Regions:
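A short, acidic, amphipathic alpha-helical segment used as a generic capping/interface helix at domain edges
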Residues: 347-362
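Conserved acidic residues
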Residues: 275, 366-368
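Electropositive, gly/pro-rich neighborhoods at or near active sites that engage anionic ligands
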Residues: 50-214, 218-220
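Short, strongly hydrophobic alpha-helical membrane anchors
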Residues: 1-23
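Membrane-interface capping segments at transmembrane-helix boundaries
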Residues: 45-49
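Alpha-helical membrane-embedded segments
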Residues: 26-44, 212, 216
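Short beta-strand immediately N-terminal to the catalytic nucleophile in serine-hydrolase-like folds
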Residues: 371
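Conserved mixed alpha/beta catalytic, RNA-binding, or beta-rich assembly cores of soluble enzyme
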Residues: 160-338, 344, 374-381
């Protein structure tokens, strides 16, 4: 409505000078009514054209980020995997993979159906990486898998935004365009985070999501570890007069493991004789909260589709074991970007919080489980 405001101002000036040129007054009046009529009948269309222009600009940026992600994935596979043939075509096919969730009309047993689908997906991805990069070792293969998944996420984000942009342009529906335009800032922030994650995965650098795994790695440092469950390790560590079973995903490759199975197995090995479980994980911070801020509470601190959380809660209920949680607050971008100093510096604070929880909630001689949750890329045992 800026043009209408301008015309009103000019009209007022003319009205204040009644002895001015009458032709100028007529021109101003005609222009004012012309602009008013245009905005009355075509205001919504003009507004939509402005929105489409904004979405189009973001779409071009998303396309560039997506193409750079694909390029990084191809170059990393070539450098590490040393394939005989060009992997670009297979990578393009990989980027279009999808996963169909289980039918939820009958919820009984849906967790096991979901776990089966996720296991099949994980196996398929690992097989694809082996075919693309035959020379990669296990750690490199895990990092490549994470790299490709980040590139896949960027490809998916771009296609969704493009879909609504073209749909809005085709139907000329203000509400279709308005919806996508309103969430664009958050979408762009997420896309830029995945772009940062691509480089971290390609170079095997720790990421913000690995904060929990980093705490566990510090606690188990210098102690013998053993494999437990899939892609998980556990170390028996003396901790403030208690016996602590410290669990994390097996690093330093990009892994999250199956902490649900690992915690269940340790509980079963000790016949439920566990005083408490303490879970450590990164959590989404709210605007205004400090990066790396530490908080504690109760419950299974673990993200993902829910399979591991379900298994942990089932084991805890079976033996009536209390569960405590310590979280490190991060932005969504920090979680998948290279580990920031503020998050790294918070690790000692987290260990101190865990120490307080163990001292206050258990007694000497008790057994406790401390589980560091998160992607352990770049973090060893």
């Amino acid at each position: 409505m800026g043009a209408i405001g301008l015309m009103l101002g000019l009209q007022n000036q003319v009205a204040q000078n009644p002895f001015g040129d009458s032709s100028i007054s007529w021109i101003m009046n005609i222009l004012f009514y012309a602009v008013f009529v245009v905005f009355m009948f075509y205001g919504q269309r003009i507004q939509m054209m402005v929105m489409l222009r904004e979405v189009e600009g973001s779409l071009h940026k998303l396309k560039y980020i997506k193409e750079e992600g694909r390029k990084t994935a191809v170059e990393t596979v070539k450098e590490i995997g040393k394939p005989q043939a060009d992997p670009a075509a297979r990578i393009d096919r990989f980027l279009e993979y999808f996963t169909i969730g289980p039918q939820g009309l009958d919820p009984a047993g849906i967790v096991w159906k979901l776990e089966h689908i996720l296991d099949v997906r994980d196996t398929r991805f690992k097989d694809e990486v082996k075919l693309m990069a035959p020379s990669a070792d296990e750690i490199q293969a895990n990092n490549l898998e994470n790299t490709l998944e980040a590139a896949m996420a960027l490809n998916y984000i771009y296609k969704i935004i493009r879909h609504f942009y073209l749909l809005g342009k085709k139907t000329y529906s203000l509400y279709v365009v308005m919806q996508i335009q309103m969430i664009l800032p958050m979408v762009m922030k997420e896309a830029e985070a995945y772009a940062s994650a691509l480089k971290a995965f390609a170079f095997g650098q720790p990421i913000g999501d690995g904060a929990g795994a980093l705490v566990a790695a510090k606690l188990m440092q210098g102690h013998e570890t053993r494999k437990i469950a899939k892609d998980c390790v556990v170390a028996t560590v003396p901790f403030e007069g208690r016996t602590a079973f410290v669990i994390k995903a097996e690093g330093p490759g990009g892994n999250v493991g199956k902490p649900g199975d690992a915690i269940k197995e340790v509980i079963d090995e000790n016949n439920g004789n566990v005083a408490t479980v303490v879970m450590i994980d990164a959590a989404l911070k709210l605007e205004g909260e400090e990066l790396g801020e530490v908080a504690e509470g109760v419950g299974a601190a673990i993200g993902g589709p829910g399979v591991d959380q379900y298994k942990i809660e089932e084991s805890l209920v079976k033996y009536h074991i209390p569960i405590n949680a310590v979280i490190i607050k991060e932005d969504v971008g920090d979680a998948v970007s290279p580990l920031r100093k503020e998050i790294f510096d918070s690790v000692e604070n987290v260990i101190e919080r865990v120490r307080q929880v163990v001292l206050e909630r258990t007694k000497e001689g008790d057994k406790v489980i401390i589980a560091g949750i998160g992607n352990t890329i770049g973090i060893g045992q």
